[in-house]
Amino acid sequence: MRVGIDLLEIARITRIAAHSGGRRIVFSTAELAYADTLGAVRCTEYLAGRFCAKEATAKALGRGLGQGLTWREIEVLADAHGAPQVLLSGGARTVAEQAGIGRIDLSLSHQGGLVVCVAVALPREAPAPASPCEAPAPASPCTDPHGTSPGRTAGAPS
């Protein structure tokens, strides 16, 4: 497992969000198509989140952007439930495959003019997360894994 994190002031993305040339270098057609459906403030927040997610993903891949990865090769779109999802292509996909990475999970949050993203790169053979409803029941506080009973020390006479 590899982890990448990035923190960004949303205001730093304002120039990129307003400049069509910069937008096309950093963001995919699908990312921009969705951003263009939003109002100006929300568009900037959305693009800042995607920028931050791309940075965190590159860190989780163990590379900086420009070191075998380009911005548009890391695409961040929403799944059916609105959660951010990473799609890799080109050099980014090659780097992930060579590192044995099967998927990258993201967590994004916006607060007070900042956006933070954590990217967790999981090995190809990593199972899907178990439902919290299916987690094994915790051991009873009265059950001792060493075969002793509460109030009795291992090896002490009964």
Where are these regions (language model features)?
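Core catalytic alpha/beta fold that binds nucleotide/phospho-ligands
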Residues: 1-158
